[in-house]
């Protein structure tokens, strides 16, 4: 019986954990996940394998168990010698039960708004929203105004309604200005010490010059948020309506001014005016909504859920809806929120706007190859600049480019919205807005849309896509 057992255990054809001559269905439950990964026969030492079986073993298995005990005491069996060499105690094979994970740390609710706290920030328990609001307010030296009695209730529902009272509440509960300043200085020092730019980020002089020109063109045609004197209006601020005519008049006026600034931006881009007038018009009409959306979305303030126009007018989400955005509103605000993690500066926004504009895949271009050649250095410039600015985040450049696809989708829906908007406004669509839309015939029944090549002869005499005549007035 012993010899038979040895043959069963040491047979060359026996797979790991399976004794020849016995069906595998008898004992597979004895192998835990850890045992299956053990060296061959490791679990046989000290009867550890059979200890895991129930007491009512089949007769053959009980006999094999006794034989195994005798075989392990034999020092002259080659097979058993191998078993003893590789065996370990059964105690070593039984994994100790893992210690339970520590309970999650629970913080007191946010001292400012009573929302769920994410930890202690600037001296007190606070949520991410109030932490970010306090940090930005201190770093940017923001000055807020309360339109009531300077005693507004601040909670997680009302915290965005009055910045003045929210900031005062931050101070009242103990948030520290100095903690913000020290944290900022510490981060600056760490960045200065740790970030060493590799030689590959050294730009050629011509690329540096291109970046400076594009950045200057953007900044001089689109003031940044911190440069604006923000003001608000109470017009239809709390409830969505189909259209607020007062807000629409203001919005259409500001949009017209923005379009003029985009044309000015385009004319200042290196190489743009070397294109044919027809191609300049095609590119501007195709990309104008893209750039308008990109620009307004960079002026999004998440704490107040507002957007600010170039004259400082600041509208909340409801007012933007009522001003004419309508069903497009939430899509635009969602895109603005997605831009925040990119932390794009003016130079990156300008370069991305230029790439949106000078794009060789637009329809009806006369010289698409020339347009593509103008776009190539802009792509390289944005790639180099983004990597030089964030050497530890090489993925930022492709993420920025992906936003162009999102912008085109929004612009398509924006053009559709303009068609329905025509039915809601009492008068005609402002001429420059109408001109910049890709399908102006939608606003005039039976009107034929001239192709850029057909219009170039009449507009080239003015020398400008905006149609400036010799007196300086603009004609749509």
From Swiss-Prot:
It comes from the Eukaryota. Residues 81-96 have a biased composition (Low complexity). The gene is rarg. Residues 81-102, 435-476 are annotated as: Disordered. Heterodimer; with a rxr molecule. Binds DNA preferentially as a rar/rxr heterodimer. Belongs to the nuclear hormone receptor family. NR1 subfamily. GO terms for cellular component: nucleus; transcription regulator complex. PROSITE patterns: NR_LBD (PS51843), NUCLEAR_REC_DBD_1 (PS00031), NUCLEAR_REC_DBD_2 (PS51030). Residues 110-175 bind DNA. Composed of three domains: a modulating N-terminal domain, a DNA-binding domain and a C-terminal ligand-binding domain. InterPro entries: NHR-like_dom_sf, NR_DBD_RAR, NR_LBD_RAR, Nucl_hrmn_rcpt_lig-bd, Nuclear_hrmn_rcpt, Retinoic_acid_rcpt, Znf_hrmn_rcpt, Znf_NHR/GATA. It is found in: Nucleus. Receptor for retinoic acid. Retinoic acid receptors bind as heterodimers to their target response elements in response to their ligands, all-trans or 9-cis retinoic acid, and regulate gene expression in various biological processes. The rar/rxr heterodimers bind to the retinoic acid response elements (RARE) composed of tandem 5'-AGGTCA-3' sites known as DR1-DR5. Residues 1-109 are annotated as: Modulating. GO terms for biological process: cellular response to corticotropin-releasing hormone stimulus; regulation of transcription by RNA polymerase II; retinoic acid receptor signaling pathway. Residues 176-205 are annotated as: Hinge. SMART domains: HOLI, ZnF_C4. This is Retinoic acid receptor gamma. GO terms for molecular function: DNA-binding transcription factor activity, RNA polymerase II-specific; nuclear glucocorticoid receptor binding; nuclear receptor activity; RNA polymerase II cis-regulatory region sequence-specific DNA binding; zinc ion binding. Expressed in embryos, tadpoles and various adult tissue such as kidney, testis, brain, liver, skeletal muscle and spleen. Gene3D superfamilies: Erythroid Transcription Factor GATA-1, subunit A, Retinoid X Receptor. Residues 462-476 have a biased composition (Polar residues). Pfam families: Hormone_recep (PF00104), zf-C4 (PF00105). A zinc finger (NR C4-type) spans 110-130, 146-170. Residues 206-440 form the NR LBD domain. A motif (Nuclear localization signal) lies at residues 184-189.
